[in-house]
Amino acid sequence: MSQILTSRQADELHRALIAYLTAANLPNTAAALREELNLSEEVFDPATAKKYEGLLEKKWTSVVRLQKKIMDLESRNHILQSELDNATPTSRQNKDPVAWLPRAPPRHTLQSHRDPITCVAFHPVFSSLASGSEDQTIKIWDWELGELERTIKGHTKAVLDVDYGGPRGNTLLASCSSDLTIKLWDPLDSYKNIRTLPGHDHSVSAVRFIPGSGNLLVSASRDKTLRIWDVSTGYCVKTLRGHAEWVRDVCPSLDGKYILSTSDDYTSRLWDVTITNPEPKVTLIGHEHVVLCCAIAPPAAYQNLAAMAGIKKPPATSSAEFMATGSRDKSIRLWDARGTCIKTLVGHDNWVRGLVFHPGGKYLLSVSDDKTLRCWDLTQEGKCVKTIGDAHGHFVQCIKWAPSVIKDASVNGDNGEPNGTPKKGGAAATPEAQIRCVIATGSVDLNVRIFAN
Protein backbone atom coordinates (compact mmCIF):
# COMPACT_ATOMS: atom_id res chain seq x y z
CA MET A 1 0.00 0.00 0.00
CA SER A 2 2.96 2.28 0.71
CA GLN A 3 3.74 2.19 -3.00
CA ILE A 4 0.29 3.59 -3.86
CA LEU A 5 -0.53 5.91 -0.93
CA THR A 6 1.67 8.42 0.85
CA SER A 7 2.09 8.04 4.60
CA ARG A 8 -0.44 10.80 5.21
CA GLN A 9 -2.98 9.25 2.82
CA ALA A 10 -2.54 5.84 4.46
CA ASP A 11 -3.02 7.38 7.92
CA GLU A 12 -6.23 9.13 6.77
CA LEU A 13 -7.53 5.88 5.29
CA HIS A 14 -6.86 4.02 8.55
CA ARG A 15 -8.67 6.65 10.59
CA ALA A 16 -11.61 6.65 8.16
CA LEU A 17 -11.83 2.86 8.46
CA ILE A 18 -11.90 3.04 12.25
CA ALA A 19 -14.57 5.78 12.14
CA TYR A 20 -16.64 3.69 9.74
CA LEU A 21 -16.40 0.56 11.93
CA THR A 22 -17.30 2.56 15.03
CA ALA A 23 -20.33 4.16 13.32
CA ALA A 24 -21.36 0.71 12.05
CA ASN A 25 -21.54 -0.52 15.66
CA LEU A 26 -18.50 -2.77 15.32
CA PRO A 27 -16.43 -1.56 18.33
CA ASN A 28 -14.42 -4.76 18.75
CA THR A 29 -13.31 -4.73 15.12
CA ALA A 30 -12.49 -1.02 15.40
CA ALA A 31 -10.48 -1.64 18.58
CA ALA A 32 -8.59 -4.51 16.96
CA LEU A 33 -7.68 -2.34 13.97
CA ARG A 34 -6.66 0.53 16.23
CA GLU A 35 -4.40 -1.81 18.20
CA GLU A 36 -2.91 -3.27 15.01
CA LEU A 37 -2.13 0.26 13.80
CA ASN A 38 -0.83 1.42 17.19
CA LEU A 39 -3.48 4.15 17.45
CA SER A 40 -4.36 4.75 21.08
CA GLU A 41 -7.82 5.89 22.16
CA GLU A 42 -6.27 9.23 23.11
CA VAL A 43 -5.05 9.71 19.54
CA PHE A 44 -8.41 8.67 18.15
CA ASP A 45 -10.62 10.70 20.50
CA PRO A 46 -14.34 11.52 19.84
CA ALA A 47 -13.43 14.77 18.06
CA THR A 48 -11.18 12.86 15.65
CA ALA A 49 -13.87 10.21 15.18
CA LYS A 50 -16.38 12.95 14.34
CA LYS A 51 -14.00 14.42 11.78
CA TYR A 52 -13.60 11.13 9.94
CA GLU A 53 -17.19 9.92 10.31
CA GLY A 54 -18.75 9.34 6.90
CA LEU A 55 -15.50 10.03 5.05
CA LEU A 56 -15.13 6.46 3.79
CA GLU A 57 -18.68 6.42 2.42
CA LYS A 58 -18.11 9.76 0.67
CA LYS A 59 -14.90 8.48 -0.91
CA TRP A 60 -16.65 5.31 -2.01
CA THR A 61 -19.60 7.10 -3.64
CA SER A 62 -17.17 9.51 -5.32
CA VAL A 63 -15.31 6.55 -6.83
CA VAL A 64 -18.59 5.04 -8.08
CA ARG A 65 -19.63 8.36 -9.65
CA LEU A 66 -16.23 8.76 -11.29
CA GLN A 67 -16.37 5.20 -12.59
CA LYS A 68 -19.79 5.85 -14.14
CA LYS A 69 -18.51 9.10 -15.65
CA ILE A 70 -15.53 7.28 -17.13
CA MET A 71 -17.82 4.64 -18.64
CA ASP A 72 -20.05 7.37 -20.11
CA LEU A 73 -17.04 9.16 -21.57
CA GLU A 74 -15.66 5.92 -23.00
CA SER A 75 -19.05 5.22 -24.62
CA ARG A 76 -19.17 8.76 -26.02
CA ASN A 77 -15.60 8.42 -27.27
CA HIS A 78 -16.56 5.18 -29.02
CA ILE A 79 -19.50 6.92 -30.74
CA LEU A 80 -17.33 9.85 -31.83
CA GLN A 81 -14.61 7.53 -33.10
CA SER A 82 -17.23 5.61 -35.09
CA GLU A 83 -18.52 8.87 -36.56
CA LEU A 84 -14.96 9.93 -37.40
CA ASP A 85 -14.26 6.60 -39.10
CA ASN A 86 -17.38 6.99 -41.24
CA ALA A 87 -17.19 10.74 -41.75
CA THR A 88 -17.26 12.41 -45.11
CA PRO A 89 -14.55 15.08 -45.54
CA THR A 90 -15.89 18.53 -44.74
CA SER A 91 -15.12 19.84 -48.22
CA ARG A 92 -17.28 17.12 -49.74
CA GLN A 93 -20.06 17.59 -47.18
CA ASN A 94 -20.49 21.19 -48.22
CA LYS A 95 -20.55 20.36 -51.94
CA ASP A 96 -22.59 17.15 -51.94
CA PRO A 97 -26.09 17.39 -50.40
CA VAL A 98 -26.63 13.68 -51.09
CA ALA A 99 -23.99 12.87 -48.46
CA TRP A 100 -24.92 15.59 -45.95
CA LEU A 101 -25.89 14.59 -42.41
CA PRO A 102 -26.88 16.85 -39.50
CA ARG A 103 -24.36 17.57 -36.78
CA ALA A 104 -24.34 19.32 -33.42
CA PRO A 105 -24.75 22.03 -32.42
CA PRO A 106 -28.04 23.03 -34.09
CA ARG A 107 -28.15 26.25 -36.07
CA HIS A 108 -31.17 27.49 -34.11
CA THR A 109 -33.08 26.48 -31.00
CA LEU A 110 -36.62 27.86 -31.27
CA GLN A 111 -38.32 28.56 -27.96
CA SER A 112 -41.86 29.76 -27.28
CA HIS A 113 -44.11 26.75 -26.69
CA ARG A 114 -45.24 26.20 -23.10
CA ASP A 115 -45.82 22.44 -23.33
CA PRO A 116 -44.19 19.51 -25.18
CA ILE A 117 -43.81 19.84 -28.95
CA THR A 118 -45.52 17.07 -30.89
CA CYS A 119 -44.93 17.90 -34.57
CA VAL A 120 -43.14 20.09 -37.12
CA ALA A 121 -43.63 20.75 -40.85
CA PHE A 122 -41.76 22.80 -43.48
CA HIS A 123 -43.46 25.05 -46.02
CA PRO A 124 -42.69 23.60 -49.49
CA VAL A 125 -41.23 26.87 -50.81
CA PHE A 126 -40.73 29.54 -48.17
CA SER A 127 -38.48 29.40 -45.10
CA SER A 128 -41.51 28.86 -42.86
CA LEU A 129 -41.74 26.08 -40.30
CA ALA A 130 -44.88 25.14 -38.38
CA SER A 131 -44.71 23.47 -34.97
CA GLY A 132 -47.57 22.03 -32.93
CA SER A 133 -47.70 21.51 -29.20
CA GLU A 134 -49.64 20.14 -26.29
CA ASP A 135 -50.16 23.82 -25.35
CA GLN A 136 -52.96 23.79 -28.01
CA THR A 137 -51.14 26.22 -30.32
CA ILE A 138 -49.34 26.16 -33.65
CA LYS A 139 -46.35 28.43 -34.08
CA ILE A 140 -44.94 29.64 -37.38
CA TRP A 141 -41.20 30.28 -37.49
CA ASP A 142 -38.69 31.60 -40.00
CA TRP A 143 -36.24 28.71 -39.77
CA GLU A 144 -33.49 30.60 -41.62
CA LEU A 145 -33.52 33.49 -39.16
CA GLY A 146 -34.61 31.48 -36.13
CA GLU A 147 -37.45 33.89 -35.39
CA LEU A 148 -41.07 33.39 -34.34
CA GLU A 149 -43.47 34.87 -36.90
CA ARG A 150 -46.87 34.16 -35.35
CA THR A 151 -48.86 31.97 -32.97
CA ILE A 152 -52.04 30.29 -34.22
CA LYS A 153 -54.82 29.49 -31.77
CA GLY A 154 -57.96 27.52 -32.53
CA HIS A 155 -57.66 24.01 -31.22
CA THR A 156 -59.04 23.35 -27.73
CA LYS A 157 -56.73 20.45 -26.90
CA ALA A 158 -53.21 19.31 -27.81
CA VAL A 159 -52.13 19.76 -31.44
CA LEU A 160 -50.83 16.35 -32.55
CA ASP A 161 -49.72 16.92 -36.16
CA VAL A 162 -49.29 19.56 -38.87
CA ASP A 163 -48.60 19.40 -42.61
CA TYR A 164 -48.31 21.80 -45.55
CA GLY A 165 -49.86 21.02 -48.94
CA GLY A 166 -53.02 21.48 -50.95
CA PRO A 167 -54.16 22.65 -54.39
CA ARG A 168 -51.68 24.02 -56.92
CA GLY A 169 -50.71 27.60 -56.17
CA ASN A 170 -52.60 27.64 -52.90
CA THR A 171 -50.58 25.92 -50.19
CA LEU A 172 -52.54 25.31 -46.99
CA LEU A 173 -51.53 24.25 -43.50
CA ALA A 174 -53.46 21.35 -41.98
CA SER A 175 -53.48 20.55 -38.27
CA CYS A 176 -55.11 17.86 -36.16
CA SER A 177 -55.78 17.59 -32.48
CA SER A 178 -56.98 15.66 -29.46
CA ASP A 179 -60.12 17.83 -29.77
CA LEU A 180 -61.23 15.39 -32.56
CA THR A 181 -60.92 17.97 -35.36
CA ILE A 182 -58.75 18.77 -38.36
CA LYS A 183 -58.32 22.44 -39.20
CA LEU A 184 -57.16 24.10 -42.43
CA TRP A 185 -55.27 27.41 -42.31
CA ASP A 186 -54.43 29.78 -45.19
CA PRO A 187 -50.83 31.09 -45.05
CA LEU A 188 -51.69 33.79 -47.62
CA ASP A 189 -54.45 35.17 -45.39
CA SER A 190 -52.52 35.49 -42.13
CA TYR A 191 -53.13 31.80 -41.41
CA LYS A 192 -56.88 32.33 -41.12
CA ASN A 193 -58.84 29.17 -40.23
CA ILE A 194 -60.74 28.52 -43.47
CA ARG A 195 -62.26 25.16 -42.63
CA THR A 196 -62.73 22.67 -39.78
CA LEU A 197 -63.19 18.99 -40.58
CA PRO A 198 -65.17 17.09 -37.91
CA GLY A 199 -65.87 13.38 -38.20
CA HIS A 200 -63.39 11.36 -36.18
CA ASP A 201 -64.70 9.91 -32.91
CA HIS A 202 -61.44 10.23 -30.98
CA SER A 203 -58.10 12.08 -31.05
CA VAL A 204 -56.72 12.71 -34.54
CA SER A 205 -53.07 11.70 -34.30
CA ALA A 206 -51.71 12.37 -37.81
CA VAL A 207 -52.60 14.33 -40.93
CA ARG A 208 -50.95 14.44 -44.38
CA PHE A 209 -51.76 15.98 -47.74
CA ILE A 210 -51.81 13.33 -50.46
CA PRO A 211 -49.32 14.19 -53.25
CA GLY A 212 -50.62 14.48 -56.78
CA SER A 213 -54.25 14.72 -55.71
CA GLY A 214 -54.24 18.48 -55.26
CA ASN A 215 -57.07 18.56 -52.77
CA LEU A 216 -57.00 15.31 -50.77
CA LEU A 217 -55.90 14.90 -47.18
CA VAL A 218 -55.51 11.72 -45.10
CA SER A 219 -55.89 11.54 -41.33
CA ALA A 220 -55.27 8.85 -38.71
CA SER A 221 -57.13 8.58 -35.44
CA ARG A 222 -57.46 6.88 -32.10
CA ASP A 223 -60.92 5.77 -33.31
CA LYS A 224 -59.00 3.03 -35.25
CA THR A 225 -59.74 4.52 -38.69
CA LEU A 226 -58.07 6.55 -41.40
CA ARG A 227 -60.12 9.08 -43.34
CA ILE A 228 -59.53 10.76 -46.68
CA TRP A 229 -60.92 14.27 -47.03
CA ASP A 230 -61.56 16.67 -49.89
CA VAL A 231 -60.18 19.95 -48.55
CA SER A 232 -62.12 22.00 -51.11
CA THR A 233 -65.48 20.75 -49.78
CA GLY A 234 -64.58 19.56 -46.30
CA TYR A 235 -66.23 16.20 -46.93
CA CYS A 236 -64.83 12.81 -45.92
CA VAL A 237 -64.68 10.84 -49.18
CA LYS A 238 -63.28 7.53 -47.86
CA THR A 239 -62.94 5.77 -44.52
CA LEU A 240 -60.26 3.10 -44.15
CA ARG A 241 -60.93 0.38 -41.57
CA GLY A 242 -58.63 -2.49 -40.69
CA HIS A 243 -56.55 -1.60 -37.66
CA ALA A 244 -57.69 -3.07 -34.34
CA GLU A 245 -56.35 -0.22 -32.21
CA TRP A 246 -55.33 3.46 -32.28
CA VAL A 247 -53.84 4.49 -35.65
CA ARG A 248 -50.72 6.49 -34.76
CA ASP A 249 -49.10 7.66 -37.98
CA VAL A 250 -49.70 7.83 -41.71
CA CYS A 251 -47.42 8.40 -44.71
CA PRO A 252 -48.55 8.72 -48.36
CA SER A 253 -46.38 7.57 -51.26
CA LEU A 254 -44.83 10.15 -53.58
CA ASP A 255 -47.50 9.64 -56.25
CA GLY A 256 -50.37 9.47 -53.77
CA LYS A 257 -51.43 5.95 -54.77
CA TYR A 258 -50.50 4.28 -51.50
CA ILE A 259 -50.77 5.10 -47.81
CA LEU A 260 -48.77 3.50 -45.00
CA SER A 261 -50.28 3.52 -41.50
CA THR A 262 -49.08 2.39 -38.07
CA SER A 263 -51.03 1.37 -35.01
CA ASP A 264 -51.18 0.31 -31.39
CA ASP A 265 -52.12 -3.15 -32.71
CA TYR A 266 -48.35 -3.69 -33.33
CA THR A 267 -48.86 -3.67 -37.12
CA SER A 268 -48.42 -1.34 -40.07
CA ARG A 269 -50.62 -1.49 -43.15
CA LEU A 270 -50.10 -0.43 -46.75
CA TRP A 271 -53.29 0.72 -48.49
CA ASP A 272 -54.06 1.24 -52.18
CA VAL A 273 -56.23 4.35 -52.03
CA THR A 274 -56.94 4.47 -55.77
CA ILE A 275 -59.73 1.90 -55.39
CA THR A 276 -63.24 2.78 -54.22
CA ASN A 277 -63.13 0.81 -50.98
CA PRO A 278 -59.47 0.61 -49.94
CA GLU A 279 -58.32 -2.45 -48.04
CA PRO A 280 -54.83 -3.22 -46.74
CA LYS A 281 -52.62 -4.31 -49.65
CA VAL A 282 -50.18 -5.79 -47.15
CA THR A 283 -49.90 -5.97 -43.36
CA LEU A 284 -46.45 -5.60 -41.81
CA ILE A 285 -46.14 -7.87 -38.77
CA GLY A 286 -43.03 -8.14 -36.61
CA HIS A 287 -42.83 -5.35 -34.04
CA GLU A 288 -43.31 -6.37 -30.43
CA HIS A 289 -44.95 -3.15 -29.26
CA VAL A 290 -46.91 -0.13 -30.50
CA VAL A 291 -45.72 1.11 -33.92
CA LEU A 292 -45.36 4.89 -33.56
CA CYS A 293 -43.99 6.15 -36.87
CA CYS A 294 -43.39 5.26 -40.49
CA ALA A 295 -41.82 6.46 -43.73
CA ILE A 296 -42.04 5.30 -47.35
CA ALA A 297 -38.64 5.17 -49.02
CA PRO A 298 -38.02 7.51 -51.98
CA PRO A 299 -36.98 5.89 -55.28
CA ALA A 300 -33.45 7.23 -54.69
CA ALA A 301 -33.14 4.66 -51.88
CA TYR A 302 -34.41 1.67 -53.90
CA GLN A 303 -30.99 0.51 -55.09
CA ASN A 304 -29.55 0.49 -51.57
CA LEU A 305 -32.59 -1.19 -50.04
CA ALA A 306 -32.82 -3.74 -52.87
CA ALA A 307 -29.20 -4.72 -52.22
CA MET A 308 -30.00 -5.10 -48.53
CA ALA A 309 -32.95 -7.31 -49.46
CA GLY A 310 -30.78 -9.43 -51.76
CA ILE A 311 -32.50 -8.22 -54.93
CA LYS A 312 -30.11 -7.72 -57.85
CA LYS A 313 -32.21 -5.22 -59.79
CA PRO A 314 -34.06 -2.45 -57.95
CA PRO A 315 -37.83 -2.63 -58.57
CA ALA A 316 -39.41 0.24 -60.45
CA THR A 317 -43.04 -0.84 -60.60
CA SER A 318 -44.35 0.86 -57.50
CA SER A 319 -44.01 4.07 -55.52
CA ALA A 320 -44.09 2.07 -52.27
CA GLU A 321 -41.48 -0.66 -52.78
CA PHE A 322 -39.75 -0.16 -49.43
CA MET A 323 -40.84 1.22 -46.06
CA ALA A 324 -39.54 1.89 -42.57
CA THR A 325 -41.38 1.70 -39.26
CA GLY A 326 -40.36 2.67 -35.72
CA SER A 327 -41.77 1.25 -32.51
CA ARG A 328 -41.95 1.33 -28.75
CA ASP A 329 -39.94 -1.91 -28.91
CA LYS A 330 -36.96 0.45 -29.54
CA SER A 331 -36.32 -0.96 -33.03
CA ILE A 332 -36.67 0.24 -36.61
CA ARG A 333 -37.74 -2.24 -39.25
CA LEU A 334 -37.22 -2.00 -43.00
CA TRP A 335 -39.81 -3.74 -45.19
CA ASP A 336 -40.43 -4.54 -48.84
CA ALA A 337 -43.80 -4.23 -50.59
CA ARG A 338 -44.55 -7.92 -49.99
CA GLY A 339 -44.49 -7.38 -46.23
CA THR A 340 -41.10 -9.02 -45.67
CA CYS A 341 -38.90 -7.46 -42.99
CA ILE A 342 -35.55 -7.09 -44.74
CA LYS A 343 -33.67 -5.57 -41.80
CA THR A 344 -34.12 -4.66 -38.14
CA LEU A 345 -32.10 -1.66 -36.97
CA VAL A 346 -31.21 -1.80 -33.27
CA GLY A 347 -29.47 0.98 -31.37
CA HIS A 348 -32.00 3.26 -29.72
CA ASP A 349 -32.45 2.83 -25.97
CA ASN A 350 -36.07 3.97 -25.87
CA TRP A 351 -39.19 4.40 -28.02
CA VAL A 352 -38.54 5.37 -31.65
CA ARG A 353 -40.68 8.45 -32.33
CA GLY A 354 -39.85 9.70 -35.81
CA LEU A 355 -38.32 8.59 -39.11
CA VAL A 356 -37.28 10.35 -42.30
CA PHE A 357 -35.38 9.12 -45.36
CA HIS A 358 -32.54 11.28 -46.69
CA PRO A 359 -33.73 12.69 -50.06
CA GLY A 360 -30.49 11.39 -51.59
CA GLY A 361 -31.48 7.83 -50.70
CA LYS A 362 -28.37 6.82 -48.77
CA TYR A 363 -29.52 7.32 -45.18
CA LEU A 364 -32.45 6.87 -42.83
CA LEU A 365 -32.69 9.25 -39.87
CA SER A 366 -34.52 8.51 -36.62
CA VAL A 367 -35.32 10.23 -33.32
CA SER A 368 -36.23 8.65 -30.02
CA ASP A 369 -37.19 9.07 -26.41
CA ASP A 370 -33.52 8.33 -25.65
CA LYS A 371 -32.91 12.01 -26.65
CA THR A 372 -30.80 11.06 -29.68
CA LEU A 373 -30.91 11.52 -33.43
CA ARG A 374 -29.38 8.59 -35.30
CA CYS A 375 -28.29 8.24 -38.93
CA TRP A 376 -28.36 4.77 -40.51
CA ASP A 377 -26.36 4.10 -43.67
CA LEU A 378 -28.40 2.06 -46.16
CA THR A 379 -25.27 1.31 -48.19
CA GLN A 380 -23.75 -0.43 -45.14
CA GLU A 381 -26.58 -2.81 -44.25
CA GLY A 382 -28.25 -0.12 -42.15
CA LYS A 383 -25.24 0.52 -39.91
CA CYS A 384 -25.62 3.45 -37.50
CA VAL A 385 -22.89 5.82 -38.69
CA LYS A 386 -23.76 8.94 -36.71
CA THR A 387 -25.43 9.70 -33.40
CA ILE A 388 -26.23 13.16 -32.09
CA GLY A 389 -26.16 12.16 -28.44
CA ASP A 390 -28.05 15.04 -26.88
CA ALA A 391 -30.14 16.27 -29.78
CA HIS A 392 -32.55 17.49 -27.09
CA GLY A 393 -32.73 17.55 -23.31
CA HIS A 394 -35.79 15.30 -23.22
CA PHE A 395 -37.75 12.88 -25.45
CA VAL A 396 -37.44 13.78 -29.16
CA GLN A 397 -40.96 13.50 -30.59
CA CYS A 398 -40.64 14.40 -34.26
CA ILE A 399 -38.30 15.00 -37.19
CA LYS A 400 -38.82 16.49 -40.65
CA TRP A 401 -36.52 17.17 -43.60
CA ALA A 402 -37.00 20.41 -45.51
CA PRO A 403 -38.53 19.74 -48.94
CA SER A 404 -36.30 19.91 -51.97
CA VAL A 405 -36.77 23.07 -54.01
CA ILE A 406 -38.21 22.29 -57.44
CA LYS A 407 -37.12 24.84 -60.01
CA ASP A 408 -40.53 25.22 -61.67
CA ALA A 409 -42.53 25.22 -58.41
CA SER A 410 -45.04 28.03 -58.14
CA VAL A 411 -44.35 30.68 -55.54
CA ASN A 412 -47.12 29.44 -53.26
CA GLY A 413 -46.25 25.74 -53.38
CA ASP A 414 -46.95 23.09 -55.94
CA ASN A 415 -49.77 20.60 -56.02
CA GLY A 416 -49.60 19.41 -52.46
CA GLU A 417 -46.20 17.77 -52.77
CA PRO A 418 -44.95 16.79 -49.29
CA ASN A 419 -41.55 17.30 -47.72
CA GLY A 420 -38.79 16.09 -50.03
CA THR A 421 -41.16 15.14 -52.85
CA PRO A 422 -39.87 15.51 -56.41
CA LYS A 423 -41.93 17.12 -59.13
CA LYS A 424 -42.36 14.16 -61.44
CA GLY A 425 -43.78 10.93 -60.05
CA GLY A 426 -41.08 8.36 -59.42
CA ALA A 427 -38.12 10.67 -60.03
CA ALA A 428 -35.88 10.89 -57.01
CA ALA A 429 -34.82 14.14 -55.44
CA THR A 430 -31.34 14.93 -56.72
CA PRO A 431 -28.81 17.73 -56.27
CA GLU A 432 -30.32 19.24 -59.46
CA ALA A 433 -33.63 19.38 -57.59
CA GLN A 434 -31.80 21.41 -54.94
CA ILE A 435 -31.87 19.24 -51.84
CA ARG A 436 -32.07 21.54 -48.85
CA CYS A 437 -29.80 20.33 -46.07
CA VAL A 438 -32.13 21.37 -43.27
CA ILE A 439 -33.77 19.25 -40.58
CA ALA A 440 -36.18 20.22 -37.80
CA THR A 441 -36.80 18.28 -34.60
CA GLY A 442 -39.23 18.86 -31.74
CA SER A 443 -39.09 17.68 -28.16
CA VAL A 444 -40.73 17.38 -24.77
CA ASP A 445 -38.05 19.89 -23.66
CA LEU A 446 -40.24 22.58 -25.35
CA ASN A 447 -37.62 23.29 -28.02
CA VAL A 448 -37.65 23.06 -31.80
CA ARG A 449 -34.15 22.66 -33.19
CA ILE A 450 -32.90 23.40 -36.68
CA PHE A 451 -29.91 21.42 -37.97
CA ALA A 452 -28.61 22.93 -41.19
CA ASN A 453 -25.54 22.92 -43.42
Curated annotation (Swiss-Prot):
Cellular component terms per the entry's GO annotation: cytoplasmic microtubule; kinetochore; microtubule associated complex; nuclear envelope; spindle pole; transferase complex
Gene Ontology molecular function, alphabetical: dynein complex binding; microtubule plus-end binding
Any Pfam family: LisH_PAC1
Cellular compartments annotated: Cytoplasm, Cytoskeleton; Cytoplasm, Cytoskeleton, Spindle pole
Positions annotated as WD repeat: 112-153, 155-195, 199-239, 242-281, 286-345, 347-386, 391-449
Any single GO BP term: vesicle transport along microtubule
Major place of residence: cytoplasm
Region annotation (Disordered) ranges: 84-107
CDD domains from the UniProt entry: WD40 (cd00200)
UniProt keyword list: Cell cycle, Cell division, Coiled coil, Cytoplasm, Cytoskeleton, Microtubule, Mitosis, Repeat, Transport, WD repeat
Parts forming coiled coils: 62-88
SMART domains per UniProt: WD40 (SM00320)
SUPFAM superfamilies per record: Lissencephaly-1 protein (Lis-1, PAF-AH alpha) N-terminal domain, WD40 repeat-like
Domain LisH: 9-41
Role of this protein: Positively regulates the activity of the minus-end directed microtubule motor protein dynein. May enhance dynein-mediated microtubule sliding by targeting dynein to the microtubule plus end. Required for nuclear migration during vegetative growth as well as development. Required for retrograde early endosome (EE) transport from the hyphal tip. Required for localization of dynein to the mitotic spindle poles. Recruits additional proteins to the dynein complex at SPBs.
Xref: HAMAP family: lis1 (MF_03141)
Complex and partners: Self-associates. Interacts with ro-11/nde1 and dynein.
Family: Belongs to the WD repeat LIS1/nudF family.
Domain notes: Dimerization mediated by the LisH domain may be required to activate dynein.
Name recorded for this polypeptide: Nuclear distribution protein nudF-2
Organism of provenance: Neurospora crassa (strain ATCC 24698 / 74-OR23-1A / CBS 708.71 / DSM 1257 / FGSC 987)
